[in-house]
């Protein structure tokens, strides 16, 4: 899921810089929230992912887009992902790994190979 917020009338999107095994290069930018069913439901006894409450919790408001898709274009049998874009007026402080960017800035990132992951590309395709 992706959180949208306007700063001085300009839409910004909260994205996450992830260091994950298998990433080509150092980091990839991903949606605000990208997690598995097990993470969401704390099946491994961990804590809820950052910003979860904006997508499924008490702060879920103003859903711009919400749609289920097959995982990785149907490559994974019976796996599905939910893409969401929500807009908020809340004052959200970006965590250490998150950053607010404009669509123009995001488009500039898309020009570089392997900087924007497939999940973020999928979510912004609605925009």
Predicted feature locations:
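Active-site ExK catalytic segment of metal-dependent nucleases
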Residues: 14-20
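Mixed-charge (acidic/basic) macromolecular-recognition segments
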Residues: 10, 21-25, 30-127
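Short beta-strand micro-motifs enriched in acidic
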Residues: 5-7
């Amino acid at each position: 899921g992706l959180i949208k917020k306007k700063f001085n009338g300009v839409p910004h999107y909260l994205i996450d810089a992830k260091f994950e095994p298998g990433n080509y290069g150092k980091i990839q930018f991903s949606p605000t929230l990208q997690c598995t069913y097990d993470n969401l439901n704390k099946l491994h006894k961990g804590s809820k992912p950052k910003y979860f409450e904006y997508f499924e919790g008490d702060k879920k408001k103003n859903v711009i887009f919400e749609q289920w898709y097959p995982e990785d274009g149907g490559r994974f049998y019976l796996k599905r992902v939910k893409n969401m874009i929500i807009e908020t007026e809340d004052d959200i402080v970006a965590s250490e790994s998150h950053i607010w960017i404009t669509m123009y800035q995001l488009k500039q990132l898309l020009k570089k190979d392997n900087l924007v992951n497939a999940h973020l590309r999928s979510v912004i395709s609605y925009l």
